[in-house]
UniProtKB/Swiss-Prot annotation:
Pfam families: Methyltransf_3. Belongs to the class I-like SAM-binding methyltransferase superfamily. Cation-dependent O-methyltransferase family. One of its GO terms (biological process) is methylation. It comes from Mycolicibacterium vanbaalenii (strain DSM 7251 / JCM 13017 / BCRC 16820 / KCTC 9966 / NRRL B-24157 / PYR-1) (Mycobacterium vanbaalenii). This is Putative O-methyltransferase Mvan_4497. The lineage of its organism: Bacteria, Bacillati, Actinomycetota, Actinomycetes, Mycobacteriales.
């Protein structure tokens, strides 16, 4: 049968497919505009070295919060509040974001961002402490969405706890699931890669979860719970 693929598109040329995939991701990453409040929070994140999700990742978090009808969300890694602002924008008006960070200064700056956005104090619960300890104190099946943006080495523990927290119909999202492509490199054997792969395995082997790996930011591993 004659192929209808255009030159360099589809299943023909692996190099062309790779270029096309890169162009699509680049387009997606630059297709989202942020308002002045989120942009200011992003600048503060740079100033304090906190890191922040890309606008495209933020927009996806907003969409997932809307799709799950999220009233209760847990975020591991407050940073300067960029991802929190995106999550809050998609949550229900009576929703509460619980956000955890070991750095009190990060949370102080995030609180400023939330205030600038007009987010009432009753809609956020900022917990300063080690997420490894804080998560264990949160109630089972009490959250609609769990977002993990933390050190790759801690992903397996956070995934285990995050899935425990999810209500049926909820979703878990893990950022930094690709490690710049290293997670998919069969020759990469370092401890970070091993931890990220273990987190992915835990999600893949849980029959209650339907996972997908999304090529935005540094890779998002998302899963919906039945």
């Amino acid at each position: 049968m004659a192929s209808t693929d255009e030159p360099g598109v589809g299943s023909g040329d692996p190099t062309a497919r790779a270029r096309q995939a890169e162009a699509i991701v680049n387009h997606a990453e630059h297709s989202i505009s942020e308002d002045a409040i989120v942009a200011a929070a992003r600048e503060r994140a740079v100033d304090i070295g906190a890191g922040a999700v890309s606008p495209a990742v933020g927009a996806l978090l907003c969409v997932l919060a809307k799709l799950t009808g999220a009233r209760a969300v847990v975020e591991v890694g407050t940073g300067a509040g960029v991802s929190g602002l995106w999550l809050l924008s998609g949550m229900r008006e009576d929703g509460v974001l619980t956000t955890i960070d070991v750095e009190p200064e990060h949370q102080r700056i995030a609180k400023q961002a939330f205030s600038e956005a007009g987010v009432g104090p009753g809609r956020t619960r900022l917990i300063s402490g080690r997420a490894q300890e804080v998560l264990t104190r949160l109630a089972d099946e009490s959250y609609d969405l769990v977002f993990i943006d933390a050190a790759p080495a801690d992903q397996p523990h956070f995934v285990t706890e995050g899935v425990r927290l999810l209500r049926p119909g909820g979703a878990i999202v893990v950022h930094r699931a690709a490690l710049g492509g290293r997670a998919g490199d069969a020759t990469a054997k370092d401890s970070e890669v091993a931890a990220v792969r273990e987190a992915a395995r835990l999600i893949a082997e849980d029959d209650r979860l339907t996972p997908v790996l999304i090529p935005l930011g540094d890779g998002l591993l998302a899963a919906a719970r039945d």
